[in-house]
Amino acid sequence: MRGAGAILRPAARGARDLNPRRDISSWLAQWFPRTPARSVVALKTPIKVELVAGKTYRWCVCGRSKKQPFCDGSHFFQRTGLSPLKFKAQETRMVALCTCKATQRPPYCDGTHRSERVQKAEVGSPL
């Protein structure tokens, strides 16, 4: 008669060792890589937009969005490991938002797109 002890015995040699934790982590690694992809140059000029006071925006960090300078979720579907920069406008005004993704003041343009490094880069390539 087989009792509860039979169920708890170690697997026979040669049997496939299933590790649910490893299986889950390898699945997660496909969608959330440990080393995020680098941002790519979306455009080499900033985009001027009117931000409305109190409204929350999501600025594209990865450079892959088709709705530049804002996020459309491309970072998730292309498995970049990057996330958009969420910010709230303090006042209604026109601003230049960076699309080269090299700014030191994200999401705002700081003129870095004029640098030789950005101008030599191809649109869609990482810096």
Swiss-Prot record:
Cofactor: [2Fe-2S] cluster
UniProt-annotated location(s): Mitochondrion
Location of the transit peptide in the chain: 1-14
Record-stated family: Belongs to the CISD protein family.
Top-rank lineage group of the source organism: Eukaryota
Protein name as catalogued: CDGSH iron-sulfur domain-containing protein 3, mitochondrial
Signal peptide (residue range): none
GO molecular function term, any single one: metal ion binding
InterPro entries cross-referenced by the UniProt entry: CISD (IPR052950), FeS-contain_CDGSH-typ (IPR018967), MitoNEET_CISD (IPR042216)
An example Gene Ontology biological process: protein maturation
Residues that coordinate or bind [2Fe-2S] cluster 2: C98, C100, C109, H113
The record's free-text note on cofactor binding: Binds 2 [2Fe-2S] clusters per subunit.
Residues noted as binding [2Fe-2S] cluster 1 in the record, renumbered to the chain: C60, C62, C71, H75
Annotated Gene Ontology cellular component terms: mitochondrion
Keyword Membrane: no
Organism per entry: Homo sapiens
Membrane spanning stretches: none
Quaternary structure annotation from Swiss-Prot or TrEMBL: Monomer.
Keywords, in A-Z order: 2Fe-2S, Acetylation, Iron, Iron-sulfur, Metal-binding, Mitochondrion, Transit peptide
